[in-house]
Amino acid sequence: MVSRRGRFVGAAVAATALLAVAAVVVVRQLTGSGPGLPTIPDKYRSTVESAARTCPRLNVPLMAAQIHAESRWQPDADSGHAQGISQFSPVTWSEWGRDGDGDGQADVWEPKDAIPSQARYMCHLYKVVKDVPGDPTELALAAYNAGPGAVLKARGIPAIDETRGYVDRIVNDLLPKYEKSEAEHASSAPSPSGSSAR
């Protein structure tokens, strides 16, 4: 028979272990570290990397964070007014959509077309908002979401809840997580063949 003291000690040990696990979960959620980090799906990695290289203002974590916010990496995403992995409206796609995979068609539903088109359009938006006061990345993201005219008219991020939430989520939540995720990816990538780690 287990004494009361033995049961108490056992319960205290179990409670301490549970608190330790909970603390680790909270720290991971607050810092964005650990297995909960978002990652670029392997099938889109090379497309995102090459698209980000086409514009000096872009980088892989920013492109990834924006795609995550737009569609959660779903190439068949359809919000009713925007389509595909990069969520282009039909009007914007007709101007900025390009054939990125070389099959002769600019297809909003094809990530190899949509992701490079997203980079091209974002690069254009950086130029459009260059004279607007504020952070250029936040302004370009706001223009992607609300349209460049809305940003120019507001002389900043327009007072549209959806747009403000979109910019905030990308810049303050997703981008830091993708920066950490990409740093971890880079540190775990095998070294190029023929080189040795010293």
Task: State the predicted function of each range.
Residues 56-83, 87-96, 119:
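Secreted/periplasmic proteins that engage bacterial cell-wall peptidoglycan
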Residues 23-75, 127-130, 177-181, 196:
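Export/targeting segments at the very N-terminus of extracytoplasmic proteins
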Residues 7-32, 186, 190-198:
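Extracellular cell-wall/glycan-interacting regions and their flexible linkers
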Residues 1-17, 37, 170:
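N-terminal export and membrane-targeting signals
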Residues 43-50, 54, 90-153, 167, ...:
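Alpha-helical segment that forms one wall of the substrate-binding/catalytic cleft
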Residues 39, 80-83, 109-112, 135, ...:
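Residues at secondary-structure transition points
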Residues 39-49, 86-91, 148, 161-198:
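Cell-wall glycan
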Residues 71-79, 128, 147-157:
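Secretory-pathway/luminal and periplasmic proteins that interact with or process carbohydrate-rich
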